[in-house]
Amino acid sequence: MSKKKIATEAAVIESYTVFYSGDAEKISPHSKGLLTYELGKEDETGSLALRLTANGEGGLFSREWITLDAIHAILERQQDSFPSRVFRSLFGQGSTNNAGFLAAVLRSPDICLIEADSSRLFMHHCYADWQHRMTQLAALSQD
C-alpha cells in the first residue's frame, strides 16, 4: 500500500507543463546526433526546470527535471573555467553522460548560459551576462 502512495506522490512531483523544446549539439566533435531537451514549469509551484528527453545516437541519460534555480546555484559558484562534472550533483541517478549533456544544452544557442573555454574544448565558462540570460529563459514561460 505504501508503494502506491509513493508512486502517486512521484507523479505529482513530476507534473510539469512543457513550454519549450529544443536541440543541442554534443560537445565532443567525435559524437554524432543531437540532444533534445525541454524547459518546463512545475504545475503546482511554478518553478522552472530543464530536462533531457532524447539522445540522437542512443545511450544512457537521465530524464529527470533539473530546476533552473539549481543550475543557477551551480553557475553562481563558478569563478573561472570549470568542467562539466560540476553539474553531477544535480542528477540523482543515471549515466556519467548527464553532466556533459547538460553542459551541452547550456551551451546551445537557445539556452546560451555557458560557452567553451577558448583553450580547452571540454571546459566551460559563464557568459558575463548569464544571469540576465537566465531571466530571459524564465520569461519564455510567460508567453
Regions found by a protein language model. Give the residues of each.
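A structural signal for long, well-ordered, hydrophobic/aromatic- and basic-residue-enriched core segments
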Residues: 56-73, 108
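Generic alpha-helical scaffold signal
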Residues: 61-65, 77, 81, 96-100
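Short amphipathic alpha-helical interaction segments
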Residues: 92-108
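Minor-groove-contacting beta-hairpin "wing" of winged helix-turn-helix DNA-binding domains
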Residues: 119-125
